[in-house]
């Protein structure tokens, strides 16, 4: 019953989105919408686990904000407005004109119009190296910050223990991210201009993570369980909310760019990735929090971070088109890590139960 209450709204939103999708483009858009929603959920399950780890520290008010205002930001901000802003920043085409290009693409799926001008899809694909550098760097920093922290519970001890020792040096994760970014920009770009834009985008991704994460740590109360109300609590909740939205943005880059392999229609992308997909990801997040899944299955958060690390590497490699990996493979990697972490957690719980069980 609890699961139905959590996912019921997502199901209602899905039905409404399917009706709008069918009215917009018939059966074809209906099918694309469902495929994009499945793509978003499969790519973002690790995102849901990380969200749950943060959301359990937030008050009921900020959880509601995440499910209401947050979903509006996900739909209209990241899945609809973000691609338009990318076209504006990289090609100098204002968002209104970019929307016109998106809604009226060339015939037969061509990447150019008869006069030789680029389509909306081509403009987005041309900006992929910068998008991949920003998102990949942000997520790689998130992964390394988790791995180099010396925590009591370790999953892949043979890797995590050495990284935790290295982490004592301080800011080692930043050094490793910068090194990875320089390697990617040096070996995966084809011109000085492209190298400069990739480096700039990657450094912006790193700075964004450091600023947002730094603010969330500075404003987070020492004991979140005692949080009730007041200015400090409000600022702490607001910062964590902002952190979740930036995190969602970084995760959405791969889905948004991957969606163009299926369609360049911004309405279908916003409905499939944003409305249906993001709503289900948020429902999964709430379900994990209410079921206390991260406390019961202690390796889940580790598996999610390893999945994030894999996604970050895949995004950075995709700066070079030859190394672009299909979204189905990307999603499968995340599922494997999270599935393995869940299985290890179950085995750990069984061993703990046997050890604590009274003897005959």
Q: For each predicted feature, which ranges?
A:
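Multi-pass alpha-helical transmembrane bundle typical of ion/small-solute transporters
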Residues: 1-360
């Amino acid at each position: 019953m609890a699961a139905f209450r959590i996912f019921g709204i997502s199901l209602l939103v899905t039905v409404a989105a399917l009706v709008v999708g069918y009215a917009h483009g018939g059966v074809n858009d209906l099918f694309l919408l469902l495929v994009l929603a499945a793509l978003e959920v499969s790519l973002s399950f690790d995102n849901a686990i990380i969200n749950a780890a943060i959301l359990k520290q937030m008050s009921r008010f900020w959880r509601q904000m995440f499910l209401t205002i947050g979903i509006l930001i996900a739909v209209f901000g990241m899945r609809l407005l973000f691609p338009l802003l990318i076209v504006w920043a990289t090609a100098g085409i204002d968002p209104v004109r970019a929307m016109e290009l998106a809604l009226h693409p060339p015939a037969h799926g061509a990447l150019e119009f008869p006069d030789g001008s680029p389509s909306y899809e081509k403009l987005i694909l041309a900006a992929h190296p910068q998008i991949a550098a920003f998102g990949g760097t942000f997520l790689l920093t998130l992964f390394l910050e988790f791995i180099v922290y010396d925590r009591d519970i370790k999953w892949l001890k043979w890797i995590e223990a050495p990284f935790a020792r290295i982490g004592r040096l301080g800011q080692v994760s930043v050094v490793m991210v910068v090194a990875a970014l320089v390697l990617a920009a040096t070996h995966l770009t084809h011109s000085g201009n492209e190298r400069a834009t990739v480096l700039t985008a990657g450094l912006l991704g790193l700075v964004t993570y450091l600023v947002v994460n730094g603010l969330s740590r500075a404003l987070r109360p020492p004991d979140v369980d005692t949080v009730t109300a007041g200015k400090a609590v409000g600022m702490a909740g607001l910062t964590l909310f902002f952190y979740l939205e930036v995190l969602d943005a970084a995760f959405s880059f791969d889905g948004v760019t991957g969606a163009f392999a299926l369609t360049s229609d911004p309405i279908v992308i916003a409905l499939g990735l944003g409305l249906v997909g993001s709503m289900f990801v948020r429902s999964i997040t709430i379900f994990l929090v209410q079921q206390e899944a991260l406390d019961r299955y202690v390796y889940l958060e580790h598996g999610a971070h390893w999945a994030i690390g894999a996604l970050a590497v895949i995004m950075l490699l995709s700066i070079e088109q030859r190394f672009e990996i299909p979204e189905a493979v990307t999603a499968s990697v995340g599922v494997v890590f999270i599935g393995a972490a869940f299985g290890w957690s179950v085995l750990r719980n069984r061993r703990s139960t046997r050890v604590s069980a009274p003897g005959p």
